[in-house]
């Protein structure tokens, strides 16, 4: 029996060698392998093979899987791009490969039982949930935007409309963690690292449950504060995120690198418009112990980027535009040359992480789509890297998932689709990839996704909107999510966190750098000409013209 390849793909998903377009980004992926055996496929539904006596094993759930996602195309920095089934047990990825009943099929990796729930993944794409390491939690509604974009892990600062830039108070952290029990996202908080004494930093870690520090110029990014934060971080194995001294009052970029003295740091919005040494903080992008990241307002570089950032800077930094000094400080941070070079550095793998900077000059729900819009822009400018865009797509998915997890010590739990990790998975229709997820699974449980008219006869009746699923209600959000804390909080055992979440210690944050990131390990001498603004990498000029329009935008959003 033969079947038309398009008809086969419509029923069973694409085969090895088939190609998929990712939204309107211009990116095309090729399926590298297929775990299915043609002619003996696993498929759920009326008259299909996922039945007792056929491809479902009559066994207790504890001997099979709780949930299986069948025949989905995985895009993952670790797994590559391939069609597999994903077995989930007790909230974690249990098996990856061919699904079915080993009593009736050969080569089964994912045992599906008569008690297993099935998510039909045929025709869909699965990615690991995105990890956003730069979120100003000024509003609880940020979580709606984050979940609706495919973010399942947040490293945050603040606990509402307060001037925080890090949270140190055990009292405040107690209530902030408690508030998150209503949301199916993993959460970690950064303590404020801008202190010349270590006492409030240690207090934040051991008593409050913070998972790292934020050193910010608005609160002090001088020599003593930066060194203090790094010393405490080295002792407790947590990450330090840096928003460096944009006024160069105490330190230039060269001075900051000397203070680091080879110690690992995560340099936020490394392009500089979001803050940092003027005009050349981008020099830190090529340094072996500096993990650089971008925030999404400058991604990809577009025609309106320069104009829109002035008002954003004034607002979030409480500047007064009638004061000449304040206006000049804002304008000095906006440089078209570094914005254009930022896209190119991402494409070369010299910047390994993207994040939102939500409500601190970024948009919580746009990191995923802006990252892939940037990838599409770079393909349009520099051309495809081969017969398909697999390498480029994997490089960019790593910026959203495994690399931020590695930087903040979360990669033993999240960031990739691997056996043993939390089953934080996002399912996408290919035509909506990067823009709007179809379903967000938190620890394998439906948490957010497309929902239809609740009074309709089927769940696909319009209007279709993104909204909370059962994993976002009742006691479930806390039970399927974790709180990332410092090991000191677990060792001391005296934190006052009321959360029912499992506490997980961050680890492996020190002594790492770009070389430890996935698919984004380029280092080199990045220089910014202070007169012309031209950016070079190892002497080669980096330029990118502002885009007139970007993908994953107006086609999907009003």
From Swiss-Prot:
Its cofactor is Ni cation. Residues 129-558 form the Urease domain. Its main location: cytoplasm. Its EC number is 3.5.1.5. It is an enzyme of class 3 (hydrolase). The keyword Lipid metabolism does not apply. Binds 2 nickel ions per subunit. Coiled coil: none annotated. It catalyses: urea + 2 H2O + H(+) = hydrogencarbonate + 2 NH4(+). Ni(2+) 1 binds at residues 134, 136, 214, 357. Ni(2+) 2 binds at residues 214, 243, 269. Carboxylation allows a single lysine to coordinate two nickel ions. It is found in: Cytoplasm. The modification N6-carboxylysine is found at residue 214. InterPro entries: Amidohydro-rel, Metal-dep_hydrolase_composite, Metal_Hydrolase, Urease_alpha_N_dom, Urease_alpha_subunit, Urease_asu, Urease_asu_c, Urease_Ni-bd. PROSITE patterns: UREASE_1 (PS01120), UREASE_3 (PS51368). Belongs to the metallo-dependent hydrolases superfamily. Urease alpha subunit family. May form a heterohexamer of 3 UreC (alpha) and 3 UreAB (gamma/beta) subunits. May also form a heterotrimer of UreA (gamma), UreB (beta) and UreC (alpha) subunits. Three heterotrimers associate to form the active enzyme. This is Urease subunit alpha 2. It comes from Streptomyces coelicolor (strain ATCC BAA-471 / A3(2) / M145). The lineage of its organism: Bacteria, Bacillati, Actinomycetota, Actinomycetes, Kitasatosporales.
């Amino acid at each position: 029996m033969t079947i038309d390849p398009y008809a086969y793909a419509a029923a069973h998903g694409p085969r090895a060698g088939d190609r998929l377009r990712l939204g309107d980004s211009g990116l095309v992926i090729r399926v590298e392998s297929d775990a299915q055996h043609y002619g003996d496929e696993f498929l759920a539904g009326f008259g299909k093979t996922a039945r007792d006596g056929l491809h479902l094993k009559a066994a207790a759930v504890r001997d099979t899987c709780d949930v299986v996602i069948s025949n989905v195309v995985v895009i993952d920095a670790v797994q590559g791009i391939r069609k597999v089934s994903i077995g989930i047990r007790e909230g974690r990825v249990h098996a990856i490969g061919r699904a079915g009943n080993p009593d009736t099929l050969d080569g089964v990796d994912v045992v599906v039982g008569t008690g297993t729930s099935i998510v039909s993944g045929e025709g869909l794409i699965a990615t690991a949930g995105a990890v956003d390491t730069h979120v100003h939690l000024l509003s609880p509604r940020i979580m709606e935007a984050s979940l609706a974009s495919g973010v399942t892990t947040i490293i945050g600062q603040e606990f509402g409309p307060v001037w925080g830039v890090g949270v140190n108070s055990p009292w405040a952290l107690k209530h902030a963690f408690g508030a998150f029990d209503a949301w199916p996202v993993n959460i970690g908080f950064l303590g404020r690292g801008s202190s010349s004494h270590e006492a409030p930093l240690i207090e934040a870690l051991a008593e409050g449950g913070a998972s790292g520090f934020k050193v910010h110029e608005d609160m002090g990014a001088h020599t003593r504060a930066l060194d203090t934060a790094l010393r405490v971080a080295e002792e407790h194995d947590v990450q330090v995120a840096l928003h460096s001294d944009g006024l160069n009052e105490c330190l230039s970029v060269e001075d900051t690198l000397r203070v680091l003295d080879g110690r690992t740091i995560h340099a936020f919005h490394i392009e500089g418009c979001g803050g940092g040494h003027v005009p050349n903080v981008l020099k830190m992008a090529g340094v072996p112990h500096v993990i650089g990241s971008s925030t999404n307002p400058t991604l990809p570089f577009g025609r309106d980027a320069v104009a829109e950032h002035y008002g954003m800077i004034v607002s979030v930094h409480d500047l007064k535009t009638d004061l000449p000094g304040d206006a000049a400080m804002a304008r000095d941070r906006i440089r078209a040359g570094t914005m254009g070079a930022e896209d190119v550095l991402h494409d070369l793998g010299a910047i390994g992480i993207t994040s939102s900077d939500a409500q601190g000059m970024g948009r919580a729900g746009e990191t995923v789509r802006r990252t892939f819009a940037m990838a599409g822009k770079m393909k349009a400018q520099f051309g495809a890297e081969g017969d398909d865009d697999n390498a480029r797509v994997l490089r960019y998915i790593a910026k959203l998932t495994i690399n931020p997890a590695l930087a903040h010590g979360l990669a033993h739990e999240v960031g990739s689709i691997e056996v043993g990790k939390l089953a934080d998975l996002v399912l996408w229709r290919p035509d909506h990839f990067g823009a709007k997820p179809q379903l967000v699974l938190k620890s394998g449980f439906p948490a957010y996704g497309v929902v239809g008219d609740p009074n309709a006869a089927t769940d696909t009746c319009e209007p279709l909107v993104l909204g909370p699923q059962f994993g976002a209600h009742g006691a479930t959000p806390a039970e399927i999510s974790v709180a990332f804390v410092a090991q000191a909080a677990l060792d001391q055992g005296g934190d006052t966190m009321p959360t029912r979440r499992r506490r997980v210690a961050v680890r492996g944050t020190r002594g790492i750098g770009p070389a430890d990131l996935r698919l984004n390990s380029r280092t080199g001498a990045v220089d910014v000409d202070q007169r012309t603004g031209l950016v070079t990498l190892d002497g080669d000029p980096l330029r990118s013209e502002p885009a007139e329009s970007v993908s994953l935008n107006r086609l999907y959003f009003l």
